UniProtKB/Swiss-Prot annotation:
UniProt binding sites for S-adenosyl-L-methionine: G32, G33, H34, D52, F78, D100, Q107
PANTHER family: 12S RRNA N4-METHYLCYTIDINE METHYLTRANSFERASE, S-ADENOSYL-METHYLTRANSFERASE MRAW
Name under which the protein is recorded: Ribosomal RNA small subunit methyltransferase H
InterPro entries registered for this protein in UniProt: RsmH, SAM-dep_MeTrfase_MraW_recog, SAM-dependent_MTases_sf
């Protein structure tokens, strides 16, 4: 089992520009790599609130961070960040929010969670085990057109239709219940394998995103972040594939541009009302980090700041 390593750790902490007495949110606690580093930069007056969908992560936080009075964990999605900030009484006063998107190494490496096409396990893929719909429900019950749409939209899978049909044909014989069963069906249906990429990679990503509503949650969270942050509060987001990064990039660009009037209205750029700016360029891992942790290779960090 791979040791969990926080990706772009130092770069994201630097991007948050942490104030010793500040208030921070780690929207994706995982195994606390980023949270631990944030706490290392805080004084006794500082506060850190963390969120995670995964009850294993929440329990880990309570076991290893529970005695730290500066720290509090919430069970749920980062799409509930405004609700949690309200409960904590810190809306409009938060100095920084960190989001480290996607599946964590402990989830990926545990066969019982069903995220990996390399490990035999139940076809589950739920980040939050308290939710009712899992990957097996979707794979065995969705219509062929819905399967194809999800594979295309969330996996950018070229052969979405062919793979969807193969799944429907296979489940007529018996339900698809394990990860390796599904991976084999996809492998057989995929006529052109990408170099250095397992043929089931895109389909598994698509199902995981769909089951966990990852992109919907991300969009909802980003919209709430500006309400949660205080003036000069920072937002740091680490994404791992183009679909996530596109949403983050577009959000930050739109917020920086502000409320643009119609093109025919004569108004100077500096007169546009905006309360957000992007900070620096997108940051990618250095070759040394990729060598040490191959899962970091596709990571992109984007940072923004609320102005007022």
């Amino acid at each position: 089992m791979a040791k969990h390593q926080s990706v772009l750790l130092h770069e994201s902490i630097k991007g948050l520009a942490i104030k010793a007495d500040g208030i921070y949110f780690d929207g994706t606690f995982g195994r606390g790599g980023h949270s631990r580093e944030i706490l290392n930069h805080l004084s006794d007056k500082g506060r850190l609130f963390a969120i995670d969908k995964d009850l294993d992560a929440v329990q880990y936080a309570k076991d290893y961070f529970g005695l730290d009075k500066r720290f509090q964990i919430f069970h749920g999605s980062f799409a509930q960040i405004k609700e949690f900030a309200s409960q904590a009484g810190v809306i409009g006063a938060v100095d920084g929010i960190l989001l480290d998107l996607g599946v964590s190494s402990p989830q990926l490496d545990n066969p019982e969670r069903g995220f990996s096409f390399m490990l035999q396990g139940p076809l589950d893929m739920r980040m939050d085990l308290t939710q009712s719909i899992n990957a097996a429900n979707f794979v065995n019950e969705a219509e062929v057109n819905e399967l194809a749409h999800v594979f295309r939209a969330y996996g950018e899978e070229r052969f979405a239709g062919r793979i969807a049909k193969a799944i429907v044909d296979a489940r007529k014989l018996k339900p698809i219940t394990t990860t390796l069963e599904l991976a084999e069906i996809v492998k057989e249906a995929n006529p052109k394998w990408e170099k250095h990429k397992h043929p089931a990679t895109r389909v598994f990503q698509a199902i995981r995103i769909h089951v966990n509503q990852e992109l919907t949650d991300l969009s909802n969270c980003l919209e709430q972040c500006l309400d949660v942050l205080g003036p000069r509060g920072r937002l740091a987001v680490i994404s791992f594939h183009s679909l996530e990064d596109r949403i983050v990039k577009q959000f930050m660009r739109d917020k920086e541009q502000g409320n643009r009037p119609p093109v025919e209205v004569p108004i100077k750029y500096e007169e546009l009302k905006t309360n957000f700016k992007r900070v620096g360029k997108a940051v990618k891992p250095q070759s040394s980090e990729i060598k040490e942790n191959v899962r970091s290779r596709s990571a992109v960090l984007r940072i923004g700041e609320k102005l007022a």
